[in-house]
Amino acid sequence: GRTMPFILLRMAVYFGITFAYIIATGAGAGIGREIARWLARAGASVAVNDLRPDRAEAVAAEITDDGSTAIAVVADCRDETAVDAMVATVADRLGGLDIAVNNVGMLPPGRQPRPFVRYRYDDWHDIIDQNLVVAALCGRAEAELMIERGGGSILFVTSGETTRPSPYNAAYAAAKAAVNHLVTSMAVELGPAGIRVNAMAPGTTMTETVAAAFTPERMAAIVEATPLRRMVEHDELARLAVFLTSDLARCITGQFLLADAGAFLSRSRPANDEGLTSPIR
């Protein structure tokens, strides 16, 4: 029968990712880690970014142990100078940049969901900085390098929270929705340079963050309200990222792809204040 290396080689050729140079931001754990690993399996050389050196180095080591090429690049993506230095390092050590997957972005510590009237300036500033601003800084630095190379593909990981009202989570949902709109503007501007820009929005995914934030009762309620009666898995999102950044999607740009097991279709999804382990009132 066919061996796994042979199958992966065929996949790499088919997807057009063989020998591509890739940066994956926010790839030290969870969804970002899985995306970095799948892109490497498809034949790419991957730069793994995370704020924590131990996590970036661990994922890069996993990829290397699997027989692919990877380096760790540590940077705080809220710092424009650090982002520029990170992208320059990727270009120098890998040889260029063809694909960028920006998974960096989160709900900052201490900014847990709360009623809209309890959001203050510092909350808005931190949440927008950690989600919209980091996306813009990374996207700009990546696009500049891709323009020099004659094209590329940029993918942003946003959130299913941008597709419906998100009570008690207004700031995060608004920041992620802004990234979706940023994608359309970038796609129009960068298209003539051969650069595609897209976003994918995961539904509730079983990550360490979700496990820590939601009670078992809330997670059960979310599953029950989802048409497919399940949460999204890391590897499903990773495979979608491979598709969107590959040659199979070379006519797709400026798009926002929802991957939520059908949660968007449900009208009975629990509000964000139901089942949180941390109090918001």
Q: Which residues does each predicted region cover?
A:
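Short, small/polar-rich loop/turn modules that mediate ligand/substrate recognition or access, typified
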Residues: 191, 196, 252-254
